[in-house]
């Protein structure tokens, strides 16, 4: 009959005028909402018809089960008396059916007994339907007396199903009376489930209802509650049992809620209340029976009838269920993860709960950090070692933040809060122990694990990508912290890397790195970034973010200890952590640094461009990162805005601890002390210089410069960095706007100058003359000067670092110079170090190509150009940065092209670069020594270098693989890969790819950077060295985004040159490094677009036109008329 009832549903809906009449008033309007209202009306009519059929069936069933009702009444009484004893005895299938149906799966057994007892499956179910409807009708009519019997029956049934009915009724006696009515309304499902039992219990409940009214009612309620509670753990079960017990799936959480829900539905469907009740029960039955299809013989019919109502109720039920899911998830997370609150805080701290997160971060840091290792469970052990000690060492003050940093990225990615929870759960087991233990072990193991973790992080490139996702915000702090500290930075960076590689370190690194970055070097991000970015925050954001990190990290992986020293410039910090992670990690790190770069740079003049560009970068970088690290997307975007905030709370709070850690790490790393101590001096210089440079953002620069200059090493610097962090972030915000405006103005001026230089670009593409150098200087000085406002300081600061490193590690700088220049190139700090090397080293190696060929001199000279990171890197510095950045990708070209930073390039370019570099180093060294102006001379030098590079390119020496290899040793990890890849690419496709590739990176960069890179990319499209100059600031950022997008587009390069890829992009956009960018298809094209474009404007235009369809928008922004006019 249930089957016939559903067929009647349409009939009822259509012909059930009375039933529809109840809703008929709104029939016209429902017809407007015909799909829903008609279904509801049809269901109501069907429910009424079904109620009638159920009523008839119920009457028949009652007649049939009158004996069974008596028996069940006696049995129910005995069951109520005996409680579970009778139920356990299960003498009657009703009791078993009740229990089974209440349990949920057993409805099948219950249905057979019910069917047997009812004699007809359809007959049993219909009577329950009628009974339900009758109960609902009584309930809707509020006739507790009438419903008393039904309620009593149903209530008695729940008692049968629940052993503790009397106890529950005693507790719920009063509530039970009300809830019992509601639950009885719900319990019709229960009574319906055992049709015979329901029928019996209906009569029996009438009898029992007097004495067992409360007990049965509460019993019924407890049954629902028991199921609800039992099932609340398992939402599906809770819903199902509630559907069983409550007959309404919607109130799975609360059986009273079921009644309330039914009441609400009744009120909604007030007129057909009985029908509604019936339909509800039918729906509840249907849901119950859909879940337990065989519970009632009538179920199929009801299900057929109720599917839509069931959907509606299921939606309502789902509505109620999600809260259950949320609460349950929270409870599960809290229960499963003791650190769940930290987890939530982590999720919220950077994204939503930033306030609690600082306090919880320590716990959550481990979870988050461990979660990052969870992503990298393989390296998780090492992250755990590091996280437990090194990570929590940071997590002492910053482990929470570290964890929150990586996991907040998860919240930011908030597809992952559950994964984070799962990962946190997986990790919590370790982390639960390591929260306290880690903090304890952190102090003891912190130093060892800092070093170990650095190594481990080198072994954690895989976790690095995943971790940055979880450590999305962490990348910001992480990137910040990464950049400044090479060794400490690495250690904190490793922790910070750890969220990326290890996780614990992630947020801890965030904090610790923040401490390092912001404490010792308030801007690990800012300092190196500022150092790098101040000269050209845009280029730095790209070339530094992209290039310095990759270069640094690859090199650092190659010459980790050296980069410890040099990474004192924050390059090592990342490389040492990232050597193995550098490929995936470098992207994160680079991406994080771009965030930080945008953060740091944003406070600087480039804040707007870095933000605009870096945001696209971060958007695009997350794409590669998404490929490698999906979370970094949220990390960077969220970290960029969040990072200042998270850095402040995350970094500031842990600053004292991290100061201690930094001091300890500094003590642990006295070797870096050479660079760091000198760097500290330089850091102070950098503070002063960067303060001068940063102007509004001296604190970011001091932070970043101190970072670069072993900022964390200095507790003074740490204190300064702490203060500077607040000032920095505040100034960053202010300077972000100011410098964004300045950057926009500069970009506009650069674009205007680009237009004029485009003529010279045409000349200088072939061979950038000194005029173009001057123009580039002007452009570079305009942008870089503004960008380099801290650039001179950066150069000076890094020069100081470079002095410290070159002086202390002059020999190291020879290998390290590549490494350092890579490291420095990798990070702007390296650039300044290179700049200092150019100043100091520039004096030493600058004039001396051999010294410069000691990649330190050349690379650092180049990288001081990288400090002009746009400028220097655009030409030779561009190459060194691509070498740095492109250790794998651009390194090849960078090294070869720059030769400067690169040994091979140093050698080949040394003939050219060396001569030119001898001259250029003279110039550039002067320029680099000039630092800010050096950046401009670096542009000029880059022009010369670009000429030389082009000569090398056209000579085929372009970027000698030897250079790449020479540089690769330094950047062996990524440089070898990217260098070889790009050396191959760079050598062969340099001219060919450059036109098209150049356009591609330009397009991607412009696209990546969107409007922001567009202007610089337009300049890039203009493709004069000046274009590189102007573009490179943006394009370094764009390059970062581009290389990151390229990293996306070029995962292979990304792997090896993932960060090199960004660096490459930076390099690619850094003028001459377009040749270096040759390493990338995009950047190679750009680089060679410099070359080929230099060689032929037609090729450049062809590359613009042919490289990508995306060039259309990009070309629109570029003003092909200008390019064509200049190039034609």
UniProtKB/Swiss-Prot annotation:
What ranges does the record give for the region Disordered, renumbered to this chain?
Answer: 1-22, 81-167, 343-509, 521-649, 677-714, 758-794, 1039-1073
What GO CC terms are in its UniProt record? nuclear speck; nucleoplasm
Q: Where is the chain membrane-spanning?
A: none
This protein's record includes keyword Phosphoprotein = yes
Q: What Pfam families does the entry give?
A: MamL-1 (PF09596)
Query: Its principal location?
Result: nucleus
Q: Which InterPro entries match?
A: MAML1-3, MAML_N_sf, Mastermind-like_N
Which BP terms in the Gene Ontology apply to this protein? positive regulation of transcription of Notch receptor target
Sorted keywords for this record are: Activator, Notch signaling pathway, Nucleus, Phosphoprotein, Transcription, Transcription regulation
- Location of this chain's protein in the cell: Nucleus speckle
User: What SMART domains does the record tag this protein with?
Assistant: MamL-1
Q: What is this protein called?
A: Mastermind-like protein 2
Give the species: Bos taurus
Specify the taxonomic lineage: Eukaryota, Metazoa, Chordata, Craniata, Vertebrata
């Amino acid at each position: 009959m249930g089957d016939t009832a559903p067929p009647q549903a349409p009939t009822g809906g259509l012909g059930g005028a009375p039933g529809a009449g109840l809703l008929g008033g709104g029939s016209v309007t429902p017809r407007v909402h015909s799909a829903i209202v008609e279904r509801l009306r049809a269901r109501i009519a069907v429910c009424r018809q079904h109620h009638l059929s159920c009523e008839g069936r119920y009457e028949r069933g009652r007649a049939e089960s009158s004996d069974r009702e008596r028996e069940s009444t006696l049995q129910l009484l005995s069951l109520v008396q005996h409680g579970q004893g009778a139920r356990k005895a299960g003498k009657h299938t009703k009791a078993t059916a009740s229990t089974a149906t209440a349990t949920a799966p057993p409805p099948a057994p219950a249905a057979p007994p019910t069917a047997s007892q009812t004699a007809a499956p359809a007959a049993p179910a219909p009577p329950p339907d009628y009974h339900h409807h009758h109960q609902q009708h009584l309930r809707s009519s509020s006739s507790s007396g009438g419903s008393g019997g039904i309620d009593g029956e149903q209530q008695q049934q729940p008692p049968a199903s629940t052993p503790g009915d009397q106890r529950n009724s005693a507790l719920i006696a009063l509530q039970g009376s009300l809830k019992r009515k509601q639950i009885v309304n719900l319990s019709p499902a229960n009574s319906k489930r055992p049709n015979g039992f329901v029928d019996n219990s209906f009569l029996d409940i009438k009898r029992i209802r007097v004495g067992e009214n409360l007990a049965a009612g509460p019993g019924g309620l407890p049954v629902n509650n028991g199921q609800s509670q039992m099932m609340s753990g398992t939402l599906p079960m809770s819903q199902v049992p509630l559907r069983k017990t409550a007959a309404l799936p919607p109130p799975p959480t609360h059986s009273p809620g079921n009644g309330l829900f039914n009441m609400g539905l009744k009120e909604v469907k007030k007129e057909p209340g009985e029908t509604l009740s019936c339909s509800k029960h039918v729906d509840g039955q249907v849901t119950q029976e859909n879940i337990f299809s065989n519970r009632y013989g009538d179920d199929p019919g009801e299900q057929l009838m109720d599917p839509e109502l069931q959907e509606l109720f299921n939606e309502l039920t789902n509505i109620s269920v999600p809260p259950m899911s949320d609460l349950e998830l929270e409870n599960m997370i809290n229960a499963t993860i003791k650190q769940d609150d930290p987890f939530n805080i982590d999720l919220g701290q950077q994204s939503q709960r930033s306030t609690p997160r600082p306090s919880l971060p320590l716990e959550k840091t481990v979870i988050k950090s461990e979660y990052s290792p969870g992503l990298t469970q393989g390296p998780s052990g090492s992250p755990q070692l590091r996280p437990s000690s090194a990570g929590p060492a940071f997590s002492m003050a910053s482990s929470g933040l570290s964890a929150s940093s990586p996991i907040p990225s998860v919240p930011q990615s908030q597809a992952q809060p559950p994964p984070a929870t799962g990962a946190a759960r997986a990790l919590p087991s370790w982390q639960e122990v390591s929260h306290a233990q880690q903090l304890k072990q952190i102090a003891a193991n912190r130093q060892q694990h800092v070093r170990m973790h650095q190594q481990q992080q080198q072994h954690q490139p895989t976790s690095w990508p995943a971790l940055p996702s979880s450590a999305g915000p962490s990348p910001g702090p992480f990137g910040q912290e990464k950049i400044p500290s090479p060794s400490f930075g690495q250690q904190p960076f490793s922790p910070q890397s750890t969220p990326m590689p290890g996780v614990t370190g992630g947020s801890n690194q965030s904090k610790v790195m923040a401490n390092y970055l912001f404490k010792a070097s308030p801007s690990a991000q800012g300092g190196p970034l500022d150092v790098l970015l101040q000269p050209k925050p845009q280029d730095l954001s790209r070339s530094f973010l992209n290039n310095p990190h990759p270069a640094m990290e690859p090199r650092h992986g190659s010459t980790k200890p050296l980069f410890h020293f040099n990474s004192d410039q924050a390059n090592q910090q990342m490389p040492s952590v990232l050597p193995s992670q550098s490929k995936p990690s470098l992207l994160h790190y680079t991406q994080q640094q771009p965030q930080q770069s945008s953060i740091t740079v944003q406070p600087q003049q480039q804040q707007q461009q870095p933000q605009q560009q870096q945001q696209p970068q971060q958007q695009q970088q997350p794409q590669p990162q998404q490929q490698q690290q999906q979370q970094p997307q949220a990390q960077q975007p969220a970290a960029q805005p969040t990072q200042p905030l998270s850095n402040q709370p995350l970094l500031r709070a842990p600053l004292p601890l991290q100061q201690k850690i930094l001091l300890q790490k500094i003590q642990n790393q006295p070797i870096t002390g050479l660079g760091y101590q000198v760097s500290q001096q330089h850091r102070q210089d950098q503070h002063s210089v960067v303060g001068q440079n940063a102007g509004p953002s001296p604190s970011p620069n001091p932070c970043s410069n101190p970072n670069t200059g072993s900022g964390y090493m200095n507790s003074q610097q740490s204190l300064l960095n702490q203060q500077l962090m607040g000032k920095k972030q505040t100034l960053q915000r202010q300077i972000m706007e100011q410098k964004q405006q300045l950057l926009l103005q500069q970009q506009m001026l650069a674009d205007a100058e680009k237009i004029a230089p485009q003529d010279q670009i045409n000349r200088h593409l072939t061979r950038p003359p000194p005029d173009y150098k001057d123009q580039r200087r002007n452009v570079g000085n305009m942008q870089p000067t503004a960008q380099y406002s801290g650039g001179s300081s950066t150069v000076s600061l890094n020069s100081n670092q470079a002095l410290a490193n070159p002086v202390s590690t002059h020999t190291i700088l020879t290998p390290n110079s590549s490494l350092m220049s890579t490291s420095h190139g990798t990070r702007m700090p390296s650039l300044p170090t290179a700049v200092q090397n150019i100043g100091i080293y520039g004096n030493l190696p600058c004039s001396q190509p051999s010294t410069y060929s000691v990649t330190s001199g050349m690379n650092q000279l180049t990288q001081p150009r990288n400090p002009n990171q746009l400028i220097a890197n655009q030409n030779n510095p561009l190459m060194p940065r691509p070498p740095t950045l492109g250790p794998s990708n651009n390194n090849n070209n960078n090294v070869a092209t720059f030769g400067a930073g690169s040994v091979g390039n140093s050698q080949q370019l040394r003939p050219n670069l060396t001569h030119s570099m001898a001259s250029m180093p003279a110039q550039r060294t002067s320029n680099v020594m000039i630092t800010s102006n050096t950046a401009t001379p670096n542009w000029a030098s880059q022009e010369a270098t670009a000429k030389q590079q082009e000569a090398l390119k056209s000579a085929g020496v372009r970027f000698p693989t030897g250079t790449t290899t020479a540089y690769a040793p330094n950047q062996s990890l990524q440089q070898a890969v990217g260098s070889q890849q790009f050396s191959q690419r760079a050598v062969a496709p340099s001219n060919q790819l450059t036109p098209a590739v150049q356009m591609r990176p330009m397009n991607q960069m412009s696209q990546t950077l969107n409007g922001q890179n567009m202007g610089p990319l337009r300049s890039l499209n203009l493709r004069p060295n000046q274009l590189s100059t102007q573009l490179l600031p943006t394009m370094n950022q764009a390059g970062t985004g581009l290389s990151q997008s390229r990293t996306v587009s070029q995962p292979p390069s990304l792997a090896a040159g993932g960060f090199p890829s960004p660096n490459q992009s930076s390099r690619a956009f850094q003028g001459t490094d377009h040749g270096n960018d040759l390493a990338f298809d995009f950047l190679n094209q750009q680089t060679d677009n410099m070359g080929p474009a230099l060689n032929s404007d037609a090729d450049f235009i062809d590359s613009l036109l042919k490289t990508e369809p995306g060039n259309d928008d990009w070309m629109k922004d570029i003003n092909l008329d200008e390019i064509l006019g200049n190039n034609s």
